[in-house]
Every structure is written in structure tokens, then in C-alpha cells.
A protein has these predicted regions:
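Gly/Thr-rich phosphate-binding beta-strand-loop-beta motif of the actin/hexokinase/Hsp70
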Residues: 2-29, 102, 206-247, 292
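Conserved phosphate-binding catalytic cores of ATP/NTP-utilizing and phosphoryl-transfer enzymes
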Residues: 1-5, 190-222, 381-384, 391-397
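Extended, hydrophobic alpha-helical segments in both membrane/secreted and soluble proteins
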Residues: 172, 176, 180, 194, ...
Length: 409
């Protein structure tokens, strides 16, 4: 087998997937050119577009819902489901047929991750799939999109790296590897996401990273993703006269991220609707959550927009007249995210345990305290002595320090 021409990196995210790659024939040492694959996907029935991100959503349509050709892709005409942008937008109106957060379910030890349990609240007539199968379908789509764009360089012949949270337990890691193998990833390596972020920083420095750090520096890597928050500490040490990066600690698996923010925003909007005399049922609340996700992304990407209209369809016969209409404002978004998820706290603050209400979606053991800064304070407090036995670094904490002090974030 010849040496692979490309090194492919895949971010299998909770809410989005991405594929980047490097052509080894045009690389020279630490100077490389990284590219992102525009991923061909359906954005509406029969409408094909290539976008940098593949939304991590799977839509399972009713057998009579779409017409022939609506799900056709350049590489197949026999698909009975949709992944990506079409799945996300169509599923927002019919959430009982939408699979989301498959990555969170894949690391949930309290369920059979090979069992057909998603969508978790689908009625009996909706065929379900497993968290493992959902992941296989996302990874398969990425492989097929690559092969469509690079017919002269088959995916199976390239070196592939798939990122995972550092806090994934052995079972979740093995399930991710199993999904990749089932999707046709024959030359695959798993890489922890904080390490990937650090490698990206090193690569972008074009060899200059050694001038930006010194022995004793402690780098805090915070990865707030769609479904999880990953915390890692990496120390700069000296060994045999060379600077090295050594991982000191990895945080607990915290099921807390963008999904929780979307749920929180949906509850904020639902309370506003209730004050106006409109009560959203559970089905509408789920649809409202997806609408808030889209509105959140719009507000965060466009600083000139102050509010985004929200429309949640009714399940009754009067689909238009029965729709719920409201909006998400920038003020509501900012207050909910900053106060709820990133409050300013003392270093002694710790996550609060409480009954699982409000921000808990059926079946997923979300973190009971949404304050990411409190989880961070607890993590740094637990690691106060982490450098005491680390060779190659000479660093002392202030007298009476109660938490480990990072020098870079």
C-alpha cells in the first residue's frame, strides 16, 4: 500500500461535524496548508449544497412524506433518511422524527447504546435508530462526501484522525472507534479534542510556539462544545534541554454545552409565552428548543440583529393559525448565557447538586449545575497539588493557594 497523500481530521461534534485535511505533497515540516472540505449535503428536499459544516442531525421521514428523488445524493439515490442541514431544518418542525445529540447518547452509560432508542420520545410508528447507528451515518456521509470530491484519492487510502472528548470513558471511546470502522475508516486514529486544539495552536504558530511559552507555564484548555464541556491542564516542562508539553489533568465528563443553552433559552421563551396566555406542550417545547438554537446562532454571528422571530407549528389541523409566534431577543440571549452558564464566581465556588428539573432532557444525565465557571473552579481546586511531583518544571504556588493557577488559557 502506498503512503497516503492526505491527512484527514474529522470533528464528530454533538451539533456539527467538520472535515479538514492536509496535502502532504505540499507540506514542508511545520509549514503546512490546512483546508476544509465543503461537505455536499441536502439543505431541503431535492436541494444539494456544499457547506463547511455538517449539522449532526438525522431525520427519519414518514414513508409517504417525500417524493422520489427528494433524498437523492450525488453518490446514491436509495437513501431513506437525511443527515445535515435538511435534517436539522425539517426536524425542527417535526421533532419526533429528528435524532439529535447522538454523541451525548453515545457516552451515556445508563442506556444500551447499540439499541434503537432515538428519537427518545418518538411514538411507536416512528422507526428508531441507536446512538451508534446515528454516529455511523454521520461518519459515512463524511466519507462519501470526500470520495465524491476526491475520486482520485479514496478516503480508505488516507490517514484519518477523529476527535473525541478527553473525558470520554473507555466504552465511549470504543463505540466511537467501532462507528468509524463500520463507516469504512480503515486507517483511523482517535485524538482527544483538547490535544487537537493545542496541536492546532502549535501549527498556526509555524514553529514559534516555543518562543511564546516558558518552563513552568500551565495552559488551561477549555472546550465548551455542543454537548460537553472538556477541561484540561497542560504544563510546559523541560527535558534534556527541550521544551515539552505534558498533560497534567483532565476534568470529569461534564454533559453541559450548547444543547443546555438551547434548552434554557426555550424555557425562557416558554415562560414569556405563558405570561401572554400561551402554554407550549412538550412537543412544542422541543420544537421551540430547535428554533432557539437557530436563533442563538443567528444572534451570535450577526451583531446587528437585535431579535430573531420564532415560529413553532401546531400539531392540529389549523397549522398556520395554530402556530406559536414569538421572538428571541439579544438581551434574553445574553442574560441567559452569561448569568446562567458563565456567572462570575469566587474560586471557592462549587457546582450545586439539585433535583433534575428544567434543563434535563429525557434520558440524558445533564450536569445539574449549568454554571460552567463553577465546574472550572472545582476542577482547578482539585488540581492544586498536580505539579508537586511533575519532573521538569520548577514552580511554586502562592502561599495558601487553594487552586491551581493557569498562566494561559
Amino acid at each position: 500500500m502506498s503512503d497516503p497523500r492526505y491527512s484527514i481530521g474529522i470533528d464528530l461534534g454533538t451539533t456539527h461535524c467538520a472535515l479538514s485535511y492536509v496535502d502532504s505533497s505540499t507540506s514542508d515540516g511545520e509549514k503546512i496548508v490546512q483546508q476544509v472540505l465543503p461537505i455536499a449535503q441536502l439543505t431541503a428536499p431535492g436541494a444539494l449544497e456544499s457547506r463547511d459544516l455538517l449539522p449532526s442531525f438525522l431525520y427519519l421521514p414518514h414513508e409517504s412524506e417525500l417524493t422520489q428523488g427528494d433524498l437523492t445524493l450525488p453518490w446514491t439515490a436509495s437513501r431513506a433518511f437525511a443527515v445535515g442541514e435538511m435534517a436539522r431544518t425539517r426536524g425542527a418542525g417535526t421533532p419526533i422524527r429528528l435524532v439529535s445529540s447522538a454523541k451525548s447518547w453515545l457516552c451515556h452509560p445508563g442506556v444500551d447504546r447499540r439499541a434503537a432508542i432515538l428519537p427518545s420520545d418518538a411514538p411507536p410508528e416512528v422507526a428508531r435508530v441507536s446512538p451508534l447507528e446515528s454516529s455511523i451515518r454521520y461518519l459515512t456521509h463524511l466519507r462519501e462526501a470526500w470520495d465524491h470530491a476526491h475520486p482520485d484519492a479514496p478516503f480508505a487510502d488516507q490517514d484519518v484522525t477523529v476527535t473525541i472528548p478527553a473525558s470520554f470513558d473507555p466504552a465511549a471511546r470504543e463505540l466511537t472507534a467501532e462507528a468509524a470502522r463500520a463507516a469504512g475508516y480503515s486507517r483511523m486514529t482517535l485524538l482527544e479534542e483538547p490535544q487537537a486544539a493545542l496541536y492546532s495552536w502549535i501549527q498556526k504558530s509555524e514553529g514559534g510556539w516555543r518562543k511564546q511559552v516558558q518552563v513552568g507555564d500551565l495552559i488551561l484548555c477549555v472546550d465548551v462544545g455542543g454537548g460537553t464541556t472538556d477541561l484540561s491542564l497542560i504544563a510546559v516542562v523541560e527535558r534534556d534541554g527541550n521544551l515539552e508539553l505534558h498533560r497534567v489533568a483532565v476534568g470529569e465528563h461534564i454533559l453541559l454545552g450548547g444543547d443546555n443553552m438551547d434548552l434554557a433559552l426555550a424555557h425562557v421563551v416558554a415562560r414569556k409565552l405563558a405570561q401572554q396566555g400561551t402554554q407550549a406542550d412538550p412537543w412544542q417545547l422541543r420544537a421551540l428548543t430547535y428554533a432557539c438554537r437557530s436563533a442563538k446562532e443567528t444572534l451570535l454571528s450577526d451583531p446587528t440583529t437585535d431579535a430573531v422571530p420564532l415560529v413553532v407549528p401546531s400539531r392540529g389541523s389549523k397549522l398556520i393559525g395554530g402556530s406559536i409566534r414569538t421572538e428571541l431577543t439579544r438581551a434574553e440571549l445574553t442574560q441567559t448565557i452569561l448569568e446562567g452558564f458563565f456567572p462570575q464566581v469566587d474560586a471557592a465556588a462549587r457546582p450545586v447538586s439539585r433535583a433534575r428539573v428544567g434543563l434535563t432532557q429525557l434520558g440524558l444525565p445533564y450536569a445539574q449545575d449549568a454554571g460552567i465557571t463553577r465546574h472550572l473552579a472545582a476542577f482547578l481546586g482539585r488540581q492544586v497539588a498536580a505539579l508537586d511531583t511533575l519532573e521538569g518544571v520548577q514552580r511554586t504556588l502562592p502561599q495558601g493557594a487553594t487552586f491551581l493557577h493557569p498562566t494561559a488559557v
